[in-house]
A protein has these predicted regions:
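Short cysteine clusters
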Residues: 70
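N-terminal glycine-rich beta->alpha transition that marks the start or flank
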Residues: 29
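Short active-site loop at a secondary-structure junction
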Residues: 67
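Rhodanese-like catalytic fold shared by cysteine-dependent sulfurtransferases
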Residues: 2-16, 20-25, 33-64, 74-104
Length: 104
């Protein structure tokens, strides 16, 4: 059951987020614009989950490393699934933005 939940929410083996960011990973924060305005990871871009499908053109390189984040990890898990379904090959769920910020 735990493995199943980890797979659904995108949590797997521990990743070195610091290294991914140093190598050019794009952090996509899928919270609302007002949530993002209240605080975010420097260098991240905000594409709310509700408009992600309409804004895929902002993510031109489908082979780029993308780390999704939100407030808790739920929306970023959905975003990861959406991006994978649209052909993005290297997408990671970073979970909540505050925890991700601490990791990088």
């Amino acid at each position: 059951m735990i493995t199943f939940l980890k797979r659904i929410f995108g949590f797997g083996p521990q990743l070195n987020y610091t290294q991914l960011v140093k190598e050019g990973a794009l952090i996509v924060d899928v919270r609302s614009t007002s949530e993002y305005a209240g605080g975010h990871i420097k260098g991240s871009i905000n594409i709310p989950l509700t408009s992600l499908n309409q804004n895929l053109s902002k993510l031109k390189n489908k082979e780029a490393v993308i780390i999704t984040c939100c407030a808790s990890g739920m929306r970023s898990a959905s975003a990861k699934s959406m991006l994978k379904a649209n052909g993005y090959t290297s997408v990671h769920n970073g979970g909540g933005w505050i925890n991700l910020k601490r990791k990088i």
